[in-house]
Amino acid sequence: MKRLIRLSPLLVVCLILAECSKQQQADYPIRPVPFTSVKLTDNFWAPRIRKNAEVTIPIAFSYCESSGRVKNFEIAGGLDTGTFLTIYPFDDSDVFKIIEGASYSLQTYPDPRLEGYLDTLIWKIGLAQEDDGYLYTNRTIAEKHGGKGLHEWASPERWLLDTVLSHELYNLGHLYEAAVAHYQATGKKSLLDIAIKSADLVSKDFGPGKVTVYPGHQVIEMGLVKLYRATGDKKYLDLAKFFLDIRGPHGEQYNQAQQKVVDQTEAVGHSVRATYMYSGMADIAAIENNEAYLNAITRIWEDIVYGKIYVTGGIGATGGNEGFADPFLLPNATAYCETCASIGDIFFNHRLFLLHGDAKYIDVLEKTLYNSMLSGVSLSADRFFYPNPLESDGRHQRQAWFGCACCPSNVARFVPAIPGYVYAVKGKDIYVNLYISNDAQIDAGGRNLKISQKADFPWSGEVEISLDPSEEGRFTLHLRIPGWARNEALPGDLYKFSDQNKESYVVVVNGENVN
């Protein structure tokens, strides 16, 4: 089957644009086009994003209410009395992730009622925050009862068991990501102020000569980078790097602390922890031009893609560690392939693309997006997989919710942001990464460009791209030729197509074949 990529005659593909003179904060050399600038018009993703807004986010908040997650904030903040109501000390994080998803969703589907609910919820979170900025409802509630009810995973003193399982810093990482998303969506600083107060405490408590416990479950690194971008305060960036650099060399492989991060060559341990850490390292590599980090994550990416990834793009072969096994040990029936790990691997591959501009990273991203991630949520958007095995006897069914609800809340925050993976820019270079029908507005080298796609992907391989610049000029359009259109199932030779199609794609510009 031929995959036709046709460019309409609205424009000549090269357009001369002035170099952007605006000074930008050092960051990724390639920048994603924000999801708010890309309106999907397809019949595949657009309905799913709407379903996420209309079904997933409301039911996720409903379960947070009924399970006691929201009530924990009310008790910690003095609005109610009682003991900690939920199972895990990281249950706060689900609320933060759903706030993040709701904030993204508001920018596509404005909803005054939802925004008002967020205002009230954030007010409750603020009440639960202690005067010095500490926010961890399990401890705050336990201290109201003389320490009774403190989770066994938490130490009597703050932070000291975070390397193990307390998840104090994990919760905060998701708080910071939610706070930046909410501020960008609404312009309100209510949650951002809570996040800054918290991060200032973490910065005060952690560092050389202070607490040197590394995060047991990575994510705060990405959250701190987002906070740095939002505020310009470099201490948050420095703290993110500190948390990465204090890992290893004598820690557990389970949470990637068996070596210093710059010495690691293999993907090991818990796959969600791992991909969140690699994504945080990519952020630091981009902002600080850190070659040691870049070399490490490049080696690790190769280890994953050449021997530890499923044909669906899923990662994590074993349930015991919810993570990676030895190379080529990829059982189908017992495959773990956690939904959160698929989302984490999408984060990781997208960041590597933004560093290098190599389509192979989008090949992995696309494979995971349409398969191992997407299987994690039902078409009705109200039932979820935690693991996604490749073989089933029929007993493995999606669930409405989980006691450990990291996957539904992750889906709720990831799906609204999918349009942000379609395009990227670097000055006058525009990258078309995913083929999804859309209408987009792109700032290309300081000039506005309208770009649209008409496609029925993944059902059909024919794509028509139209470009309409605000004024005549020159730019470079990079069209990704997917690996599967070049007879490559995934980068490397782990998987091969049984049928090789030599004539697999055609590029036509203004009616002229330019292959």
Each language-model region and where it sits:
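Glycan-recognition and catalytic cores of secretory/periplasmic carbohydrate-active enzymes
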Residues: 23-515
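Bacterial N-terminal signal peptides that target proteins for export
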Residues: 1-9
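C-terminal motif of bacterial Sec signal peptides marking the signal peptidase cleavage site
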Residues: 16-19
